[in-house]
Amino acid sequence: MKKTTKPPTGGYGGSGSHELYQRVKKKAGTIKASSRRWLERHLNDPYVHQSKVDGYRSRAAYKLIEINERYKFLKKGQKVIDLGAAPGGWCQVAERIVGSSNEKPSVVGIDYLHVDPLPRVAMLEMDFLHADAPQKLIETLGTKPDVVLSDMAAPTTGHRQTDHLRTIYLCEVAADFALSVLKPGGHFLAKAFQGGAENTLLAILKQHFKKVYHVKPPASRSESVELYLLALEFKGKTKIQE
């Protein structure tokens, strides 16, 4: 796959984006200052521009690309499950790397939000926290995964510690799923928010994987508290787990 982790340093290009920017400026008095700042940052984000060029559905695709370029845990022929997949950027990246087909998809995503169909990717529209979700994922994939990805994050409240705890909970649920379904030697990548509560999860991951890392890829905004937990080379189920 073409290297795309160093997008142009300029703002979002094209006449369409310029027109949108002008509309944003004209309506500046009718929207909150925080919303206006977000729109202006979004329009000038080089990753947003590059995602249009490369055909990815979100700038988040580059977070996965950058992490994988460094640690090379996604490889051709693997089976992948993506939790919290909307709008589909991570599934696109995974499919392009591991290879897949419409008849027998190697990448399965799940989200309670609707995701428009993606070529060679199976998508389940359901809440991962539903009791039936884990079984549905394995049935759809047809085998145990080599990689479990999770970009799940709880809706933010504006209270940093609350947001941290809610997202860490989702990370813990994703990790529990990964520990129960991964093939030996498999890998797990999940979003977390910095705040301290991730230390317990890190300790658990270190028991079950040979290598565990904190990762903050360049595509993750510097002011964001998000980071990613990457656990490599699953040791396999212990007798207690079994």
UniProtKB/Swiss-Prot annotation:
Active site residues according to the UniProt entry: K191 (proton acceptor)
Descriptive protein name: Ribosomal RNA large subunit methyltransferase E
PANTHER family registered for this protein in UniProt: RIBOSOMAL RNA METHYLTRANSFERASE, RRNA METHYLTRANSFERASE 2, MITOCHONDRIAL
Gene Ontology cellular component annotations, sorted alphabetically: cytoplasm
E.C. number(s) listed in UniProt: 2.1.1.166
UniProt keyword terms in alphabetical order: Cytoplasm, Methyltransferase, rRNA processing, S-adenosyl-L-methionine, Transferase
Compartments it resides in: Cytoplasm
GO MF, one annotated term: rRNA (uridine-2'-O-)-methyltransferase activity
Presence of keyword Methyltransferase: yes
Gene field: rlmE
Family statement: Belongs to the class I-like SAM-binding methyltransferase superfamily. RNA methyltransferase RlmE family.
Organism this protein belongs to: Bartonella tribocorum (strain CIP 105476 / IBS 506)
Annotated binding of S-adenosyl-L-methionine, by residue: G88, W90, D111, D127, D151
Role of this protein: Specifically methylates the uridine in position 2552 of 23S rRNA at the 2'-O position of the ribose in the fully assembled 50S ribosomal subunit.
Reaction(s) the record says it catalyses: uridine(2552) in 23S rRNA + S-adenosyl-L-methionine = 2'-O-methyluridine(2552) in 23S rRNA + S-adenosyl-L-homocysteine + H(+)
